Structure formats: structure tokens, C-alpha cells
Amino acid sequence: MAAVLESLLREEVSVAAVVRWIARSTQGSEDNAGEAAALSSLRALRKEFVPFLLNFLREQSSRVLPQGPPTPAKTPGASAALPGRPGGPPRGSRGARSQLFPPTEAQSTAAEAPLARRGGRRRGPGPARERGGRGLEEGVSGESLPGAGGRRLRGSGSPSRPSLTLSDPPNLSNLEEFPPVGSVPPGPTGTKPSRRINPTPVSEERSLSKPKTCFTSPPISCVPSSQPSALDTSPWGLGLPPGCRSLQEEREMLRKERSKQLQQSPTPTCPTPELGSPLPSRTGSLTDEPADPARVSSRQRLELVALVYSSCIAENLVPNLFLELFFVFQLLTARRMVTAKDSDPELSPAVLDSLESPLFQSIHDCVFFAVQVLECHFQVLSNLDKGTLKLLAENERLLCFSPALQGRLRAAYEGSVAKVSLVMPPSTQAVSFQPETDNRANFSSDRAFHTFKKQRDVFYEVLREWEDHHEEPGWDFEKGLGSRIRAMMGQLSAACSHSHFVRLFQKQLLQMCQSPGGAGGTVLGEAPDVLSMLGADKLGRLWRLQERLMAPQSSGGPCPPPTFPGCQGFFRDFILSASSFQFNQHLMDSLSLKIQELNGLALPQHEPNDEDGESDVDWQGERKQFAVVLLSLRLLAKFLGFVAFLPYRGPEPPPTGELQDSILALRSQVPPVLDVRTLLQRGLQARRAVLTVPWLVEFLSFADHVVPLLEYYRDIFTLLLRLHRSLVLSQESEGKMCFLNKLLLLAVLGWLFQIPTVPEDLFFLEEGPSYAFEVDTVAPEHGLDNAPVVDQQLLYTCCPYIGELRKLLASWVSGSSGRSGGFMRKITPTTTTSLGAQPSQTSQGLQAQLAQAFFHNQPPSLRRTVEFVAERIGSNCVKHIKATLVADLVRQAESLLQEQLVTQGEEGGDPAQLLEILCSQLCPHGAQALALGREFCQRKSPGAVRALLPEETPAAVLSSAENIAVGLATEKACAWLSANITALIRREVKAAVSRTLRAQGPEPAARGERRGCSRACEHHAPLPSHLISEIKDVLSLAVGPRDPDEGVSPEHLEQLLGQLGQTLRCRQFLCPPAEQHLAKCSVELASLLVADQIPILGPPAQYRLERGQARRLLHMLLSLWKEDFQGPVPLQLLLSPRNVGLLADTRPREWDLLLFLLRELVEKGLMGRMEIEACLGSLHQAQWPGDFAEELATLSNLFLAEPHLPEPQLRACELVQPNRGTVLAQS
């Protein structure tokens, strides 16, 4: 494999040819003959190139001090050795991947050969983190291997080096030379666990002082040391050897002893590492300089290696995509590099070739390599959460090395809406009683029924006790609850009792542990009347603070072991403490049935023709439904795998030899608890892999070492491997899987391939032609895989370890490093002033629990009634506050504004300044709204509840319902008021200020004369709304149906026009829309006067106005139009076809009033002659009766031809032809 890499670095073969050579066995048409010949001889070793490359990069970066959890080295048979080293290991023999440190590599020269034959992962040595204590490598027996970058000793054919000896005096702080009292020295082949402590930094964030490392293999910052393979690292912590149970006490003793030594000596003491070792001392030579692209060495080599590394990642040739991204982020954020000692022998340039010289010679090389890789995977980076994108976009190293990539990341951050919350959901309430299944008819006897009810109560007592005590230090589940759980299991003798209890257990599991949105908790919602006053920005900061305090800080590195976080731990411990075969069997049956039901659930299909925006909006509900189903399936499958493989799990190492063969023969005859292979095949054929694969991964993560060797499960792993190879992220086309769906599958499959029980060489096996990745040809064209059902929130909920990328970048920003024991949480406090005494969160949580318990024991109609009352009373409370408190404040604002106007005089003031002055005085009074709202809800809610509930409701139930309704209504009302009362007061005050200032009219310079009401105006004019109603009554009486005795008096018309003048002159309550409406109504009234269509009260013979009265009213209207209306008056409506057509119904037709009105409009300058001529011309285009059209033409000619007179001399114009015999009427 080294030959391939050297050929690549010498540019004898291209990167594309190497990638094609790795990915497929046949020669591509793109490969030239020279490249094919160079690679054809190494075809048998093709599968070992990728692990060799990964281990090579780990070893080359071993001198870098990374930030955050270290990245494990890669795997199987191929080690990162150069040619001349003994051959690779056999496929069958493997070491336990779960051990924290691999066996020592150089205890003797004879130990090298057995080590090379181990099938375990080859881990390159790496530097220790610099921190207050000793490095991870301290205390390692044997000598370290010399060489630049921490490379291993070469075999035959590699240049030899002079042996180096130590001449330093003994170091009393070396735990290897001077171990703690009572410790057992490790033997070369010891199988008993060592009591010597490999010290790790003790901090509060590490649960039980476990080192924050990847569980799959040791970090790159560890050198080999002895570690017994019998030590079990199973997630439930069974089978720890007795020698390891007092690790905490020995850690405390070691820490005290070290503090004494530091107090006695002025300088820190630490073991002196062997010369040539990359281990730095406490005062070692460390460089801390900013990365500079101009100081990158071997730029061409780095670009080639980065390109082939990126190509392997893009083609899914590496087991875990996000593990490689984490490694790249480590290189990007590396701060220091261990410098070589002056006494180290330097290699001659003649000896160094392209592979022997260090790849990463400085921090500049590491950052350059990382940036080159990240540029190739921008599509993956752009789909990370918004916080990670922000940290990447603000990384100064990215800006320095690749401004283009930094700009693209910033654009992706600005356009991203993927805000991810990792807050764990809170514990929910108990499962309500199920009358359809848990009734007496479903039990064999009364005794069994009562036993079940009793055990149900015991179960919830145990659950409540666990919730109260499980976080207390020193509390143990088995000691506290184990005997009670086993006694409860002993009483469930009947099979039906087990079945009912398992159903309850499963429902409670789903209700407590299911997290559809990934975010839970109601901490911020418990005091909305206070928190909503913070504003959107500060409230968002408080949300982020809550997430940082409640979310788990670390998931155990980029490859955490399968665990049971939060409430899941209760159900795991319950199963272990129960130790009941019957319960486990019923539980497996119930879980299997529920998994098959949910996996076959019909989910909405995606329509590919939808527009992107509309599709995204429409699919929000479908995404939530899919998330609920998927998370439920993952939870159920996790517990099914845990229970199904529990009998086979143990602390002992996996069997080998004949024992393994006999176990395989025996277990191959046992049918699986669930036919997961068939379900997987159906899911792939139906294109529902995004639903099936994630829960299958959870199930397989708890398999023991023998399971992957069984033929049944071997087929499953082969299918998953081929699916992993087919999910190439760069291949996007019509009908292909959505990008985030692929990313989810790659993340869960990559995590599965790092599980210790999965064969190390499985991922790099040669693909046999016999077992093809079969997909049904009649598969649906569009399935769940093609639907955008996965978003970033679901991705991070299913794969929380992806969040380690963000934490790694955050540790770089905050300046933390390995010496701080982990990541630092930099929190900026946000404070606020409380509006009043608020109940504690504990009290509110208790009240909510009591309310839920109360409703569980009552009919559903009671809950609906109480919620209805709370909703309506809360709404009425808000309306009441608007009508009382807000209205009073608006009146105060008007009074204060008038005082301000009088004080400032005619020049007035700035409206914006006036508004701010008024709001600053009145808005603080909005705090009274909360007290008034609580009083209103307490006064109104009980009566509403009593009115709606039945009379036979018990007094205690009625009282509790009233109290709950009061609380809910108060919460709803106060939540709205606290969030909106200030804005509501500002809006109403602003409207009042605008109305008052508008009534004052425009500025004197703009209007030429005063157009508003006078200072002495008392504002007693009729309201515009009332006046509009009265004018409309007259208009409707004139044009609509009426009784013969209905009509209006001339005096009423004059009074109406007088009131119109008063309203127009006193503009206190007149707004532009009302003024426009009044103008239109006045024009309609003038049209009716001209047509003589207004019925007049009086003697039966008199139903029309006298000519003098009509002209007097028209004069009043002309005066109003001329003097009082400030807005435009639609006088063109006078000559509209509808209004002129009113004259057609008059017998005899009299046109004198219309002619008089037109001449007055011209005289007063309200309309021009050209405008009237245009209106009259448009009237000729309408369809009129013949005689009316002739009279209208005569009127037009007369108006345009005759000179204008002050008063018309004719009562009726000569508008008809003589042959029609029309009598002329003279005035």
C-alpha cells in the first residue's frame, strides 16, 4: 500500500485512477495503460489501501495537539507500515476494539511479531494533551518508538537508527517505576485487570471520571499500553472486575499525592520521556504561532494526499463520514505541535523519500490540508446546523487559507434556517388508564385484575422514587429499588398479567423517552409574563442559555457507544433488576409487534412536481409525523436489541476456536426474535430505507460478538454495506434519494460500523459477485427516500454525535484546550426586572402535574370544559383590558397632547418627539394590566365553570376545576398582555396623536390660511359617522321604496347641511376617509336636488321643493365644497350617467337647476368649462331614449353657446323640437 501512495505522490498515477482502482475491481476505460499496469499487480491488496491511508494520516498527525475528543485511528488488517514490514494479519483473529489502550508494542523485541498478527486496529502513537496532570502516555511501560511524527519502527529494509538510552535520574512521580500502594504490576500476557490508573483529568463534566475518548479505539493522542481485553465496556456496565471498582478512590489518592509533590518542589515533576519520543514534558518545547499559508511546506504533496483522501470520503470508501470530518476539524483547530529535540538524529535528505518525510511538518501544513479537504465537502458542511456554520464562517484560519470557502460558508449560514436544539425532553406524566384493554373482562379472575392494578401503582411508585433520587451521588438503582421490582415481578404470575404490564411498560417508555422535536422542557414557558418582556433578541439568548445548561455537553466523542440517556436509563435498569424471563419474553413480543406496525405504517408520498417553496411548507406536517414514527421505532428497536441479546452479552472476550464454531452451529438454529432481514429487504425494495435502516441500526448496535458471524446477520450487514457504498452524496438526479436522507443513513451506518462487536474487516471486504444488492424492478417510482422527510433537527436528534463538530469549533473559539479537561462553556448572563412575585418553577411544575393527575381520573368532557372556559375568559380578559385600562391611557394621552400643543404655541412640535414623550409617561402603566387581568380571571372563571358543568358534579371536583380554570385563564391572559400590552398602548396612543395633529390641519406655510378648528373650538360638532348615517337615510328615502307619508322637510335638509358645515370646520374627529365619504354623499344629495327626487313632507299636492328652496340648498352645498372641504370632492359624479338619468323620470323634465349648478361650478372655480364639456360629451355615448337624448344635446349646446348670467332667466329651456308640441315654460 505504501507503494501505491508513493506512486501517487510521485505523480506516476492519477488520483482518479487510484479511486477507481479502490472502488471497483474492473479496469475503467478512463485509465491509461501505464496506470493500469502499475496498479494491476497490487489488485489483491486493494482493500487494504483505505485503512492504510487513514492510519497513515493519523500517524502523520500524531505530533499535533488536537482540541476536544480525539479521533480514533482506523482499522482492519492493514497497518500503516511501509514495505518490508511483516505481512498483514489473518482475517479471523481480532482484538477487542472496546479497550481504551492497545497492548504495549515494544516491551520486548519478541513482542513485535505477535502484535503484528493481531487483527485489532493499528493505532498510531500520538501526543498527550497538555494539561495540569500527566499525559495519557505517562506511565506506559517499555520504550517508545523513535521517529519523526511518532511513526512505528520499520521492519527489514528500513534504515536503522542508533539505540538511545536514558541517563536521567529516577523520577519519583513516575507511576510505572513507583506505582501506588496496592497496585498490581502489569504482566506481558496478563488477563487480570490492572489496578494501576492511567490518569485522566478529573472534572465535573465527565461522568464517573470516565475519559472522554472514542470507544472504538484509542485516540491519536495515546501511545500503546497494556490493557486487559477482559475489561467490559458495555453500556450498561456489567461485569466490571473487582479490581476496577475502587478507581475513584485511587484517583483521589493519586491526586492528593500529586498535589503534595507540587507543594514540596518549586517546579513541576513529571516522568522524563525517552529521547526520540514525541511525548512532551510539562516544560517541553511547544510552539504556539498563528497558521500562515505562506509557510506551508510540500504544498503539492499535501494537495495530492488531500485530494485522494477527499475522494475516498466522497465515494463512501471510509467507514464513517463524520468521523473523518471530525479528524479534519481537529487539524483545522490544532494549536501546537510537538517540536523535535535537538538531540534527535536527523535523517539525511538522501534517505528521505516522499513517504518517509513527515507529511505535517508544522501547524501550517495541518491547516492547509484541512482546508483542502473541507473545500471538497462544502455540500456536507452547508447542511450542518446553523451554529456550526457560524463557527466555521467566523474561523480566521479559513479566512486566511481560503477566502472563497469562507465566503461560501458565510452565505450558507445566512441562508440557513437549520436551528438545532439538543435539549433533552422532560419526564412526562403517567399513562392514563386504558379502559378498553385494562378492564376486568380481559383478566382471568378478580384476583389477577386487582393484582395488576396494585402492581401498576407499585410501578409508578418506583418511577417516582427513581425520578427523585437517581441524580443523587451514591444512589444505586439495584440497592434502592431492585428488591421491590423483583417482588412485583413475582406477583405477576399469570400470563395475562405479564401481557398487561408489558403493554403499560411499553406505553410509558414511549411517552417518557420519545422526543419528536428533539427539544423539550417548559422552563421558559412557565413564566411567560416575565420572559416575554425581554424582547425577541434577549429571549433568544435565554433559550440558547437553557439549551447549553440542559443539553448533554458531550455524547462521548464522534463515535459514542450505545447508551441509554435520560429516562431510558430507568427502563434499562428496571429490566436488569427484574431478571424475569417471562417479562423479557412478553416484552420482546410486544416490541416486535409494535415495530412491525410502525414500520408498515403508510406515510404520505411526496409529489415531485410541487414547487419548492410550496412543497417545503406543505411538508412540515409530514416531517413531524415521520419524525414521531422514526424516533418511536428507534426507541423500541433499541430496547428490543438490548433484551434480545442480553443473555449473550458479558464481560468475557469473544470465543475463539472450537468453542466459537460450536456456538455458531448452535445459535444458527435459533430463529431471530424479529425477521429484520425481511423487513430490511422490503424497505429497500419499497424505497423506505430512510425509515427502516435507522431503527435497524439501533437494534444491531446491541448485538454480541457472535451475531455478525451468523449467516443470517451476515447477509444484513452485507446489505447495509452495499447500501452505504451506494449513497454517494454527489450523485443527485431525478428520482434519487434526498440529500439529508442520505446524510442520515450515512451517519447511522457509519456509527454502526464503529461498534466494537461489528467485525473490523467487514467494511473493507471484497465485494463478492454472488450476493448482489437487489432492488425490485417493480418498486414504486417515488417512495419515502425521495421525500424531504429529514431535516437537520431530526438528523441531530438521531445522531447527536454530529454535534461534536460544533463543540470542537466552539472550544477553539473559547480558547480551551486539552489542559482544561474538556470544553468550556462561555455563558453571558441575561437579567431582567420582574413585574411581580412569580411562583417558583418547582411550584408551577407541581401544579401542572397535579392538574394532569386530576384530569386523568375525570371524564374527558371535564377537561374540554375547563379548557374552553380558560380560553374564553382569557380572551374576554384581554378585551376588558383594552376597553378599560388602554382606553383610559388613550384619553390621558389626548389631554397631555392638548397641553403640549397649547404650551408650544402655533409653531407646534415634532410629532415623533411628542409621541415618545407620551409613551414614556403612559407605557409604564401597562404593568397594571397583569394585576387587572388576574383579578378579572379570578372573578369570572368560577362562575363560567359552574354554569357549564352538570349540577350533580361533586363539590370537590367543582372546586378543583374552578381553580384549574382560573390558573389556565390567568396564564393565557397574562401571557398575551405581557407580550403585547406595551405595543398596544403605543399603537393606540400613536393613533390618538395622529388624529389630533391631523385635526389641526397642515402647517400655516403650506396651507396659506388656517383650515383646522380654532383654538376656542369646543368640539361639539356632530360625529362624522352619525352625519354620514343621516345623509344616507335621506338618500335611501329618495331612491328607495317608501310609504306615501314618508319624506323630509326643507328645514331638516337645511339643518343637515348646517351640521355638515360644523363637522367640516371642527375637525377633531374627522379623518380623511370620513371626509371623502361625506364629499361623495353631498354630491349625491345635490344630484337628487337637481332632479327634484327628494320627497318633501307637507300637503298631498306638495311633494317637491320650491325653486327658491332648491337653489338655497344648492348654494349651501357650493359654499361647503368651496370653503370647508379640504379633500377633493368628486363633482364629476354630478354628470355621471346614473345621476343625469334621474331627470328622465321627471315629468315634465326641467333642466334649469342643472344648468344653474353647472354655471355656478364654473364661476366658483370648482370645475372648468373644458372639464364640464368633456363630461357632457361622454354622456352622449350612453344609451338614452330618443327624446331624452335630444333634450340632453340641446342642454349641452345651450351651456356652451350662451353667455353666463348670474341667474338663469328661463325657468325651462327650449329643449324640444317644435313639431313635438312641447310647451315652453318661462321663469
UniProtKB/Swiss-Prot annotation:
GO terms for cellular component: cytoplasm; cytosol; endomembrane system; nucleus; plasma membrane. Ubiquitously expressed. Isoform 3 is not found in erythroid cells. Residues 214-232 have a biased composition (Polar residues). Residues 128-137, 247-260 have a biased composition (Basic and acidic residues). It is a multi-pass membrane protein. Keywords: Acetylation, Congenital dyserythropoietic anemia, Cytoplasm, Disease variant, Hereditary hemolytic anemia, Membrane, Nucleus, Phosphoprotein, Transmembrane, Transmembrane helix. Coiled coil: none annotated. Residues 188-208 are annotated as: Interaction with ASF1A/B. It comes from the Eukaryota. The keyword Phosphoprotein applies. Changing residue 714 to W: In CDAN1A; partially disrupts ASF1 binding and loss the ability to arrest cells in S phase and inhibit DNA synthesis. The chain crosses the membrane at residues 312-332, 626-646. It holds the Pfam family Codanin-1_C. The modification N-acetylalanine is found at residue 2. Found in a cytosolic complex with ASF1A, ASF1B, IPO4 and histones H3.1 and H4. May act as a negative regulator of ASF1 in chromatin assembly. It is linked to Anemia, congenital dyserythropoietic, 1A: An autosomal recessive blood disorder characterized by morphological abnormalities of erythroblasts, ineffective erythropoiesis, macrocytic anemia and secondary hemochromatosis. It is occasionally associated with bone abnormalities, especially of the hands and feet (acrodysostosis), nail hypoplasia, and scoliosis. This is Codanin-1.
